[in-house]
Regions:
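Polar/acidic, low-complexity leader/linker segments enriched in S/T/G and N/D
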Residues: 1-38
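Mixed-charge, glycine-accented linear interaction segment located at domain edges/termini
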Residues: 6-11, 124-128, 191
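Short, solvent-exposed beta-alpha or beta-beta edge segments that form flexible loop/patches at the rim
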Residues: 24-58
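Short beta-strand and beta-hairpin "edge-sheet" elements
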Residues: 24-28, 85-129
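Oligomerization/assembly interface segments of phage tail-like spikes and tubes
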Residues: 44-69, 114-128, 197
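Extracellular Ig-like/FN3 beta-sandwich strand-entry sites
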Residues: 56, 85, 192-196
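Short amphipathic alpha-helices in soluble, non-transmembrane regions
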Residues: 74-84
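Intrinsically disordered, low-complexity segments enriched in serine, threonine, and glycine
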Residues: 129-216
Length: 216
């Protein structure tokens, strides 16, 4: 498979660029510790709110091409004017099922002796998680149990109902129950965790759950 990268669904290979390398390091967790005199262990607040938050994702993409300086400048201008300083969706051909979101900056360099030009695209403010390209949609007709499978990123689904519907689910030891009419709903308490999440639906019509999964 030819290494490529898509930015906002545009293949950079089709613009004449070869992808030399990509660097997508894992974002670090947001940590906050307090050292207390007399204690042998610090007070850690990494999971103080019940879940872990992460630093912005940083990544770098190195592109190259062979040609004259004029050709290089033209190709650089095409990429820079489209994407530099803009919030973009980035998909690598190695992992086409997920995408990153972040603001791109560009740094070109050209060697007249070899005729090789390079363009480095970098991001320092990317979303921590990589998102699934395809939105997850689960539809239930009538009443019954629904299992919502989720990747590692916690996410709150959008619930669409076509009539009077009652939803019931459990988070840890706490139970929740919501009765709604036809419409579109979001319940912060219905945050899906990694793995399988079960809910009970009581309805005569259709109930649809939509959410976008993600992972580090």
């Amino acid at each position: 498979m030819r290494p490529d990268v898509k930015i906002n669904d545009l293949s950079l290979f089709t613009l004449g660029w070869l992808r030399e390398s990509v660097d997508f390091p894992t974002p670090q967790s947001q940590t906050n510790t307090i050292v207390v005199p007399g204690r042998n262990a610090p007070i850690r607040y990494t999971e103080a709110l019940g879940s872990i938050s992460y630093q912005p994702r940083e990544f770098t993409i190195l592109l190259s091409m062979l040609g004259s300086r004029t050709q290089f400048d033209s190709k650089v201008a095409e990429v820079v004017n489209r994407f530099a300083g803009r919030l973009c969706k980035v998909i690598c051909s190695d992992t086409p099922q997920v995408y990153a979101i972040g603001t791109l900056e560009a740094e070109p360099a050209y060697d007249p002796l070899t005729g090789k030009g390079q363009l480095t695209l970098s991001c320092e403010d990317g979303d921590s998680y990589l998102y699934h390209v395809k939105e997850t949609v689960v539809t239930k007709s009538g009443s019954g149990t629904v299992t919502l499978s989720n990747d590692y990123m916690p996410v709150v689904p959008v619930v669409e109902t076509t009539g009077e519907t009652t939803l019931a689910w459990r988070v840890g030891e706490e139970e929740f129950r919501k009765s709604v009419s036809a419409g579109t709903w979001e319940f912060p308490e219905m945050e899906l965790q990694a793995g399988e999440n079960q809910l009970t639906v009581t309805a005569d019509g259709m109930t649809t759950f939509r959410y976008r999964e993600g992972r580090l």
